[in-house]
């Protein structure tokens, strides 16, 4: 039995999962549910562009709206390569220049080992899950 599909439409097979959007959780926090490459690179690129614009606006004195902090949900990330690590560092730097914070959460043991080996555990803030990360972000913004 063939699956139902509209006439003239072929089945679409995806090699990779669809890119997960970056969700605006509140006026001050956005949550990125990251996947493996190539989605990881696309999402990190989107965050980098956002924070670059915010940093440029801040530098030029045009910071009308408050820059959103970011929670990077890495629950679906199964590996990190050197390019991914460079993207994490770039987003962190740009967020800092824009006056925002970045928090990583839901890290698997395998990814945690990579973060420890590269000393990124000393640079980033971490939370166990998204809910804890959001609570920590709200407390940080409250100061």
Which role does the model predict for each range below?
Residues 52-59, 63, 93-96, 138:
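Residue-level signal for alpha-helix termini/capping positions
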Residues 60, 65-75:
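A structural preference for short, pocket-lining loop segments at secondary-structure junctions
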Residues 69-71, 79, 83-131, 135, ...:
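Amphipathic, Lys/Arg-enriched alpha-helical "gate/interface" segment within cytosolic domains
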Residues 12-55, 74-76:
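STAS-typified acidic loop motif
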